[in-house]
């Protein structure tokens, strides 16, 4: 059984700490948080106002510089675009003239070929065909004669030999008959002997015919004539060269034209100078009163809103004391009833509903010390031990420590109980809640101070490493170059898309038509060639007929096909592109001028002022947060002080309390 232990607080003592309840503390913390937030916000507005007003001159100068230099850079940029546009226009015009010259040359050649080329082609074809036919006939005749005469001569020789033998036999028989007439006169004898001598034998031969042949030099001469006869392509090329002489001269003249000289010197174009109007009242300086009024109205509104909210929170902190008072009163009343019931009914443990039916005297909860019997079990102490175990452990732990270091001072029972009660009062649930909040807030404030100190040290070490010139010459310049390059790339993509749409929608039908016509012409030529081959292939008329058809029809079709191909290849538009590097070089050369150099120096000085002001603002912000952390630390110490104030309060109460 748990013995009586008075190390707990009665109703009056509990009510003395009611203002330390968690709800009131939360309202107070919310009020402090709102106050700190309002203070930080007001400091931020004050920093912004100071920064704007201190940099009014810089803002005015930069605004004036931008306003005064804008016409200059617009003029530089516009003159560049005008110059490039005119150059591309001249180039396009010259290219168009060159195409017209070429088209005129081709049309003239076609007309000459159409009217004179046909007859010229037929004439050349007739000459070539005649020579080729004569060469072929001569070759066949020579081959036939030279191959046939020899065999004919041999056959004739064989026949003549047989005939000679027969004749010789006849002559021999005649001579024998003549010898029978020996009585003729001498004259006759003389004539007969002479005749006999003349036809003594007959030898018939055609040896000369055997050596008969036609020499091949005739064929060589004909081939030489065929080789020396000009073809139609040679005649056509010769005519084309004669016609193209003036046109070629015109094209050379067009190519030799310098487009830059035609456009003229771009330096003649007017570029507005960079003005330095120091008498201009800047946009910031002219509105200082409005800026100050704006920040004042913001600060006033913030101050009024903060006061109203803090008052409401403090009222809420006071209001929550009443339900806490009632709850504490009801709890103590139930506990005292339970304790008295236990005293009158030793081993009885009635339920809460049964307590209401018991007819007993209700004790005064504010003056119940006389009812405590030290040797009996205390129900309130048991309740405290069961329902607040950690609080009981903390109280016992602190009591043991005090007892260990002060054994001689607390030997009697009264002092021991007084000591236990003081520890219980100081280590009550509400008091420990205040102590925990204060210690946690103090620890967080220490961490915040460490962070802000490291930040300030890093800023102080690195703030002097900022090189104004390197920043001005690197980041801004590279940013400008990157922006110009990005702009030129995007514009070129837009131009490319427009060029594609133009070629597809305007000239697309020309490409489709020329392709279709070319296919038709090719089909016609192949059909004509196939028809000629079917009719005349393998005959002497094939080549002459093919030549005639080529002169009359196919050459014209080939010319049309070539013209359609040329139109197909030339039927497109190439729009000029923008070169970002040229623009960057132009802007760089413009920045190197006297006015621009002075303006850049002024910009560098202004940039230095901005950097210095930025450093001051950062230092001010760091100091503001440092001050805010100090305030938070003070608040945490206040909470710890509130808890510490419970010690003298407990000592005073214990001085007049009877243990």
Swiss-Prot record:
Membrane-protein topology: Multi-pass membrane protein
Major location category of this protein: membrane
GO cellular component: mating projection tip; plasma membrane
Localization: Cell membrane
Positions of glycan attachment: 136, 146, 203, 237, 258, 461, 473, 518, 537, 572, 591-592, 595
Keyword Oxidoreductase included in the entry's annotation: no
A GO BP entry: plasma membrane fusion involved in cytogamy
Segments on the Extracellular side according to the record's topology features: 1-17, 128-305, 453-632
Highest taxon of the lineage: Eukaryota
Cytoplasmic compartment residues: 39-106, 327-431, 654-659
Membrane spanning residue stretches: 18-38, 107-127, 306-326, 432-452, 633-653
UniProtKB keywords: Cell membrane, Conjugation, Glycoprotein, Membrane, Transmembrane, Transmembrane helix
Known function: Involved in cell fusion during mating by stabilizing the plasma membrane fusion event.
PANTHER family xref list: PLASMA MEMBRANE FUSION PROTEIN PRM1
Similarity section: Belongs to the PRM1 family.
Name assigned to this protein: Plasma membrane fusion protein PRM1
Gene encoding the protein: PRM1
